[in-house]
From Swiss-Prot:
This is Small ribosomal subunit protein eS6. One of its GO terms (biological process) is translation. SMART domains: Ribosomal_S6e. InterPro entries: Ribosomal_eS6, Ribosomal_eS6_arc, Ribosomal_eS6_CS. The keyword Lipid biosynthesis does not apply. Keywords: Ribonucleoprotein, Ribosomal protein. The gene is rps6e.
Length: 217
């Protein structure tokens, strides 16, 4: 039974989009069960409707970031509008917050999510078997109905990357001069590496995708 970790990138979540400082509060009413911990679905967070509008989170997905000493913790979540939450505050799972920072409240920031991950299994995952790098599939499989996701690459359970230039559901050793699969330390350096072909098989564990938006005229 195939299981794929789908990495979703949002090309319209630019680096210059607004970032707002917020108080992050743990909310015991927000569920953080096995599905959320195993990334089968995004956890929920609660935001004031005015803050959610400012973030311009088209898909309703935001990232809450907390910095503690020299570490940072990201909580990418499906935002729910709640007028009872102050505009400068975000509510997240109390269990998650306590586990990460050992407190019920913390200082943080929130912004439109640039990327996130969802894990899918059969029967949804079966629909991706045989697709190739450059193909698209229905975003509804990962909670993005109405959008297509473009396959950009992936890797197997040994970390061997899929290469667009290698046709078929294969694994082979090839001579590489650059990524994916090899990052040369010197100009002109080449190395023989094991890679996967451009086709998704049961051996693939991660699929890298990007959201396809309508072309702007």
């Amino acid at each position: 039974m195939p299981e794929f970790k789908i990495v979703i990138s949002d090309p319209e979540a630019k680096a210059d989009l607004p970032v707002y400082k917020v108080k992050v509060k743990g909310d015991e009413s927000i569920e953080y069960g096995d599905d959320e911990k195993n990334q089968r679905k995004l956890p929920v967070c609660k935001l004031n409707p005015k803050l959610l509008e400012k973030l311009n989170a088209v898909h309703g997905i935001v990232t809450v970031r907390i910095r503690k000493e020299d570490r940072k913790f990201n909580y990418t979540c499906k935002a729910t509008a709640d007028a009872n939450v102050p505009e400068d505050t975000v509510h997240v799972s109390l269990e998650w917050l306590g586990d990460k920072v050992g407190a019920e409240e913390a200082e943080g920031e929130v912004f439109r999510a640039k990327a996130w991950q969802i894990t899918i299994t059969s029967p949804a995952a079966d629909q991706l078997i045989g697709l190739k790098i450059g193909d698209t599939f229905d975003g509804g499989l990962v909670g993005l109905p109405g959008y297509k996701l473009l396959i950009r690459g992936g890797s197997d359970n040994s970390g061997f990357p899929m290469l667009p230039s290698i046709p078929g559901p294969v694994k082979k050793r090839v001579l590489l001069s650059g990524p994916p699969g090899f990052h040369p330390r010197e100009k002109g350096e080449r190395r023989r590496k094991t890679v996967r072909g451009n086709t998704i098989t049961h051996d693939i564990v991660q699929i890298n995708t990007v959201i396809v938006y309508p072309k702007k005229e």
